Amino acid sequence: MPRRREVPKREILPDPKFGNVELSKFMNVIMESGKKAVAERIIYGALELIEKKHPDKDPLEAFTVAINNVKPMVEVKSRRVGGANYQVPVEVRPVRRLALSMRWIKEAARKRGEKSMAQRLANELLEATEGRGGAMKKRDEVHRMAEANKAFSHFRF
């Protein structure tokens, strides 16, 4: 992997319905095999379901709150020191924070039991806004690992 220069970040256009860049990124996370129309249908369907279940809540705000709640602050990275592997807690960069939270929400939604992906996603997002659900469990697990390995934080990268 060449280390010559930093690759410029590609600018992602906001989604057509809400004009939100984060929603557009989430669409790309949900998308499989280049089927953006399917991903779009799933996400907009989930946001409509959120609006139906909670007419008082703005679905876009619920989405943003869910993403922010799931974002991890610290994670562990393996570091080899003197023949032993240590799990060293490190702070998560903001871009990775967003990517991880979106990925965890997607994975948690996939594991749910509801019929359609839109329903699964809507329920996962609603649970994440309330601080529970599979994605929140994953974040708490990562935080617990970092807390348990706090003693190795002096091995920072």
UniProtKB/Swiss-Prot annotation:
A Pfam family this chain is assigned to: Ribosomal_S7
Function as written in the Swiss-Prot or TrEMBL entry: One of the primary rRNA binding proteins, it binds directly to 16S rRNA where it nucleates assembly of the head domain of the 30S subunit. Is located at the subunit interface close to the decoding center, probably blocks exit of the E-site tRNA.
Oligomeric and partner information: Part of the 30S ribosomal subunit. Contacts proteins S9 and S11.
Molecular function GO terms recorded: rRNA binding; structural constituent of ribosome; tRNA binding
Protein name: Small ribosomal subunit protein uS7
InterPro entries, per the entry: Ribosomal_uS7, Ribosomal_uS7_bac/org-type, Ribosomal_uS7_CS, Ribosomal_uS7_dom, Ribosomal_uS7_dom_sf
Swiss-Prot/TrEMBL GO biological process terms: translation
Keywords: Ribonucleoprotein, Ribosomal protein, RNA-binding, rRNA-binding, tRNA-binding
Gene: rpsG
One cellular-component annotation, GO: small ribosomal subunit
Family, as annotated: Belongs to the universal ribosomal protein uS7 family.
